[in-house]
Amino acid sequence: MRRRVVVTGLGAITPVGNDVATTWRAMQAGVSGAANITKFDASSFPVRFACEVKGFDPLKTMERKEAKRADLYAQYAVAASVEAMADAGLTPGVYDVDRTGVIIGSGIGGLKSFEEQHDVYRERGQSKISPFFIPMFIADIAAGVVSMRFNARGPNYATVSACSTSAHAIGDAFRTIQYGDADIIISGGAEATVTPMAIGGFANMTALSDRNDSPATASRPFDLTRDGFVMGEGAGIVILEELEHARARGARIYGEVVGYRASADAYHLTGQLPEHEGLQRAMRGALADAGMRPDEVDYVNAHGTSTQLNDSNEATAIAKVFGDAAQRVSISSTKSMTGHMLGAAGAVEFIASTLAIRDGVAPPTINYCTPDPACGDLDFTPNQARSREVRAALSNSAGFGGHNVSLVVKRYQE
């Protein structure tokens, strides 16, 4: 019999808050994290704004030498993990280190370090490349650093699946605990891609909104006038724990993870199958895994990137999977506020889904002003959070390469 898995800790570094409480308050209030880029001189770029993390100090959670040898994405991961472990009440001696694992991914990894060291190579030659460059750059190092931080000696690896990365991480953590290979997993993702190469590359493929005169209204998922996503960054970390282990130590339980399914489009490098058929399979599979009907889900945190094709395809997919229940489910894209956090997006959105259950509130899709007929007549929770019962929530993620993930979390009941 599969073991039950619950959520006992949450941590986040986002463009709208450097902890979970601040982030969640901002989401409920409909606060946009978008503003002009400050991390580099973007004055010559076609896109000059992003959703940056603000006021982040890695020295609050890392020693100076450790922080110096870690890329920004890994610093974000450590900070969010420290919050999540404290939130879960997991202090040394409380958990079995051999039964505690880490699954933390990144869509791109240490891009900031790569760009900086490439400049060093071009300007000063090979001999001046930092000996720490490779471990700072690779996408698995956040998982490694976090495992060392907490002496977690169980399963330890990184998922890398573009914008589905941290949803895969949470799903794999769920399965790992279900099947008995660990009792606790620190799971999620981190990203730090407000850099010249990332902004330039995504802008050149016309994936980004170019509303430079109005950053705060640029991310507008499902709106007729949407013109691309807004780059985000940060980290989301979720502590998953086997139910009886959590109960034995008197842990607070946010919710129970009950469904996970991953699928592939096998279709296009950056586009989705028509009607997001691959995501439909992920949603149906996650609901089947949970043993739930669509009408038992009250909230869907959509992938909702604010790009033309994704949003219309995803809306169609939700309508097809939910059928008659699609008219009563609350749907929103929190990317309208955080921007697209790439490899960290799925975890932050799973956190929002979990808190929606706890607090009985659906966060809004901000900047939704003009309905798009291609997105149908679904309830995208426009512009204001809505109080409502949320018994269960489904969170969608999709990534370049055709990676789709759906996760289902529900209210915990003994």
Positions of PLM-derived features:
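ACP-dependent fatty acid/polyketide chain-elongation machinery
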Residues: 1-66, 88, 244-254, 351-365, ...
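Acyl-CoA/ACP chain-elongation machinery
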Residues: 181-227, 260-274, 304-311, 328-378
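Condensing-enzyme catalytic core mediating Claisen C-C bond formation in acyl metabolism
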Residues: 4-8, 32-35, 213-290, 299, ...
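Active-site-proximal alpha-helical scaffold in enzymes
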Residues: 77-90, 139, 147-191, 229-251, ...
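Conserved catalytic cysteine-centered active-site region
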Residues: 1-2, 36-79, 99, 109-172, ...
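Phosphate/pyrophosphate-binding loops at sites that engage ATP/ADP/AMP, CoA/4′-phosphopantetheine
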Residues: 84-96, 246-253, 283-299, 321-325
